[in-house]
Amino acid sequence: MIKWPWKNSQPQVQTLEHWQAAISIPLLAPLSDEERQKLVTLADQFLKQKRLIPLQELVLTEIMQQRIALLFSLPVLSLGIDALDGFHEVLVYPGPFIVEEEWQDDIGLVHTGKMVQSGQSWDQGPIVLNWQEVQDSFDLSGFNLIIHEVAHKLDIRSSGEATGVPLIPLRDIAVWEQHLHGAMDALQEEIDLVGEEAASMDPYAVHDPAECFAVLSEYFFSAPELLDERFPDLYRCFQKFYRQDPLARLKSWQSSVNYRAPSIY
């Protein structure tokens, strides 16, 4: 077995004080003190294992790097840092970026052209982000660019390609697919009825099962009450896979005497 020099089997415990400014965002406010400590330890490991590469003259300050690492670590809080082994680099643009892409239309014709992207997750390569929308991921709105791309990487770990079914026990796959496709069908019906702009959730979820898993993972962590209300069975599937219960965490925080959403700066 090869031992990579940057992998530390005994991660150092990071002090919350050093990460206090970075962790003070609404998305992470519901975490308990124990979860916060675990999260910053994972985030520190992340920064030691991955290269953050700013593009187009973007300057990544320490707090920017810490917040990127914290958001990458949140979905794997219980899965562990090894769940993020599928990449070594994170490329960060200042804003949405243009890429040359191929796509197939409804009748099978292949087209090539320039497309604006928010982020990308290559099957055997880096994750690409844009800082503008990373900043939009700090709240509890249901949108989270980093969690979306992490979900794709977790999906790919299962079979080598993104199918919408991450690494779960074989006995759970049929139920998972049933609820995932059920959510896609329900969202498509809603879109057909009220249109994409008025839909209750991001219409990109109906694109394919892989995108549905990624989009609804965003809601699982940043708007769990909406996912649980719309698709409670799927929420429980996600809860079992991620080994977290963001809704219970959110309710506990909201009922606490210290309930106060932090300001983002």
From Swiss-Prot:
The keyword Protease applies. Its cofactor is Zn(2+). GO terms for cellular component: cytosol. It is an enzyme of class 3 (hydrolase). Keywords: Aminopeptidase, Cytoplasm, Hydrolase, Metal-binding, Metalloprotease, Protease, Zinc. InterPro entries: MetalloPept_cat_dom_sf (IPR024079), MtfA_enterob (IPR057256), MtfA_fam (IPR010384), MtfA_N (IPR042252). It is found in: Cytoplasm. Zn(2+) binds at residues 111, 148, 152, 211. CDD domains: Peptidase_M90_mtfA. GO terms for biological process: proteolysis. It comes from the Bacteria. Its EC number is 3.4.11.-. One of its GO terms (molecular function) is aminopeptidase activity. Binds 1 zinc ion per subunit. Belongs to the MtfA family. Interacts with Mlc. Involved in the modulation of the activity of the glucose-phosphotransferase system (glucose-PTS). Interacts with the transcriptional repressor Mlc, preventing its interaction with DNA and leading to the modulation of expression of genes regulated by Mlc, including ptsG, which encodes the PTS system glucose-specific EIICB component. Shows zinc-dependent metallopeptidase activity. PANTHER family: MTFA PEPTIDASE (PTHR30164), PROTEIN MTFA (PTHR30164:SF2). This is Mlc titration factor A. It comes from Pectobacterium carotovorum subsp. carotovorum (strain PC1). The gene is mtfA.
